């Protein structure tokens, strides 16, 4: 399905059962920050890295493939993959599951570390400034996050 915005296909979801693996226990409306939550450091992100890693390496490939299917495309039709920049092992795993060579995968985690929800927009901005994106390129943005949540979107680049 082609939308006017350049969106070719999208997949997203959430599984609250994994919420305990990546969360901020306090600081929101459900559990407002207090002296106690600050002292307990509950206003910071808590993560079970091993569980999040296992989730990330399986979901990034699945969600990307589902978004590609909705776009009636195959991975080899992609010009570039922009994965969430959590760590290099997760990035290479996502590329491997899509059978994408690393020269088609934008990586900047080595420069900035994990910039959380900003990682894909930063990567897109970098790629555009570097001239790595051309009008008509088929790209995919592929990520995961707290909750546990995931999403992938296939786009036709229009700039």
What are these regions (language model features)?
Residues 1-54, 58, 62, 144, ...:
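Condensing-enzyme catalytic core mediating Claisen C-C bond formation in acyl metabolism
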Residues 57, 61-62, 68, 79-159:
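Claisen-condensing/thiolase-fold acyl-transfer catalytic domains that form or cleave C-C bonds
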Residues 72-77:
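Short, surface-exposed connector motifs at secondary-structure boundaries
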Residues 52, 67-71:
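Short helix-to-loop capping/linker segments positioned immediately adjacent to catalytic or ligand/cofactor-binding
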């Amino acid at each position: 399905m082609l939308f006017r915005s350049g969106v070719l296909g999208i997949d997203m979801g959430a599984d609250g059962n994994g919420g305990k693996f990546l969360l901020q226990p306090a600081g929101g409306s459900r559990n407002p920050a207090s002296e106690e939550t600050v002292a307990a450091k509950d206003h910071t992100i808590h993560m079970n890295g091993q569980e999040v890693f296992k989730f990330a390496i399986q979901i990034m490939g699945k969600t990307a493939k589902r978004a590609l299917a909705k776009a009636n495309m195959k991975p080899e039709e992609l010009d570039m993959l922009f994965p969430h920049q959590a760590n290099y092992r997760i990035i290479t795993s996502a590329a491997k599951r899509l059978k994408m060579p690393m020269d088609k995968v934008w990586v900047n985690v080595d420069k900035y570390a994990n910039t959380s929800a900003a990682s894909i927009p930063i990567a897109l901005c970098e790629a555009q400034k570097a001239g790595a994106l051309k009008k008509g390129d088929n790209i995919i943005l592929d990520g995961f996050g707290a909750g546990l949540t995931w999403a992938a979107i296939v786009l036709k680049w229009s700039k």
